[in-house]
Regions:
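Short loop/turn motifs that connect adjacent beta-strands in outer-membrane beta-barrel proteins
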Residues: 47-56, 92-102, 151-157, 203-209, ...
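Transmembrane beta-barrel strands of outer-membrane/channel proteins
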Residues: 57-69, 102-110, 160-166, 199, ...
């Protein structure tokens, strides 16, 4: 992938760390459960109270917006971006104070507005760029996503998250074609990578609210004729309406 900067590597590193933490915590869970079965331990009333705020499955919705700000690293294209999604989460591992959730996001709508740069012939001996704005729409899926919650037994839980997914746009992204460069465009199919954090507020045993920020990257992974990449600072809000 072009423009593979240190910031981009940090996001991949965060996803790797959360994945490793998940497997470690999951292994600890299996060990604890085996010991509990062997000794015939019973679940205490205190643990049952904790479980009221720690159910394994969750359903929710969320939405986010990234304003058009200066690009984060060389080569990325300036853009504004917004998306909404439906989320299924499952708590797959815990430690005493942390919990790991595996999440799947269905994204019915994403919108990006970006700057187009078309090479044109200004005069017989002068080339220039025709710059304007273009909007594209997409839908997609985020099948690989992890969220690491801290203070898992509290009603206010800070968290870290990392995710990888895909978006399919209604047109090639970007599209810089001109008479001088007729093939200067990306692809409709793009990959996404995100990493960040936030705070989850638990209101009762069935509902919670989430406020967060994530670095969000869109790229066709150099499968198109061009791949400038799009980077966004995405602020988002989520609502979990069912836990079971």
């Amino acid at each position: 992938m072009r423009n593979f900067s240190a910031d981009f590597r940090r996001v991949i590193g965060l996803l790797t760390v959360l994945t490793a933490f998940t497997f470690t915590a999951f292994a600890q869970n299996l060990t604890s459960e085996s010991k509990a079965d062997a000794t015939g331990e019973s679940v205490s009333s205190a643990a049952q109270t904790d479980d009221a705020f720690d159910k394994k499955n969750e359903l929710g919705v969320w939405g986010g917006f990234a304003p058009d700000i200066p690009r984060l690293f060389s080569g990325s294209r300036k853009s504004s971006f917004a998306e909404v999604g439906f989320r299924y989460s499952r708590r797959i591992a815990t430690t005493e104070n942390t919990a790991i959730k595996y999440q799947i996001d269905l994204i019915p709508l994403a919108i990006i507005n970006y700057r187009v740069e078309r090479l044109i012939q200004v005069s017989p001996n002068v080339l220039g760029y025709n710059r304007d704005r273009q909007t594209a729409y997409a839908a997609g899926l985020t099948p690989v996503s992890f969220q690491l919650n801290f203070r898992r037994k509290a009603k206010i839980q800070p968290f870290l998250s990392a995710a990888a997914g895909l978006l399919i746009f209604n047109k090639s992204l970007p599209d810089d074609r001109s008479a001088l460069r007729p093939n200067q465009r990306g692809r409709q199919f793009n990959f996404t990578l995100a990493g960040g954090g936030g705070v989850e507020f638990l209101t009762d045993d069935a509902r919670s609210y989430t406020v967060g920020f994530k670095f969000h990257h869109i790229s066709n992974a150099s499968t198109g004729n061009i791949n400038p990449g799009f980077d966004q600072n995405l602020f988002y809000f989520g609502y979990t309406f069912k836990k079971f």
